[in-house]
Regions:
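Solvent-exposed, non-transmembrane regions of membrane-associated and secreted proteins
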Residues: 1-171
């Protein structure tokens, strides 16, 4: 996963995001995870995902975490802006990248996130992807989430409709 505008580069856990007390809680600080569940319509990232894709990652306070670049808790604002792009490469996509464009930004209370129609939509939402993290203020508990809505924009890479991303060295 790569978001050029904020320099975020992330790998993924091999398993679906775990749940702790009914809330998504990635198993590690340094990897993102995709959330799927038999009782939810969530899908894995793909060019033909027929419903919403959910990717989660931790933000840290006093320790580094994978989604730290997504939100500035001290200034209380998203670092991703509407129109920024994100690239995801999956086992299925091979050398190709799935390209998404940021469409909406949210910072709901954790307790209301699961029912927030402005985040989840109503009915199936093909091509929609959410990145979800905690807003982790310094020396305070996390009570809100940083959520970015993304819309699938196409496939990038060799022989695809879009050019591949220019990756940072070492990726």
């Amino acid at each position: 996963m790569y978001i050029p505008a904020i320099g975020l580069v992330a790998g993924f856990e091999h398993e679906s995001c775990r749940l702790v007390d009914g809330l998504i809680d990635p198993a590690t600080l340094n990897l993102a995870c995709a959330y799927t569940a038999p009782d939810r319509p969530y899908r894995l990232p793909g060019s033909n995902a027929d419903d919403i894709v959910v990717i989660a990652g931790h933000a840290g306070a006093g320790t580094a975490a994978v989604f730290d670049p997504m939100y500035n808790a001290d200034a209380d604002h998203h670092n991703v802006q509407v129109g920024d792009v994100m690239y995801i490469r999956t086992e299925t996509s091979g050398d190709h990248w799935l390209k998404y464009t940021a469409s909406d930004l949210h910072s709901p209370e954790k307790g209301s996130l699961s029912q927030d129609v402005s985040v989840w939509g109503e009915g199936a939402t093909p091509g929609r992807l959410l990145t979800i993290s905690c807003i982790q203020p310094s020396f305070a508990p996390s009570v809100r989430n940083a959520v970015v809505g993304w819309q699938f924009a196409g496939v990038a890479g060799p022989g695809a409709e879009l050019p591949p991303p220019v990756l940072p060295q070492g990726m």
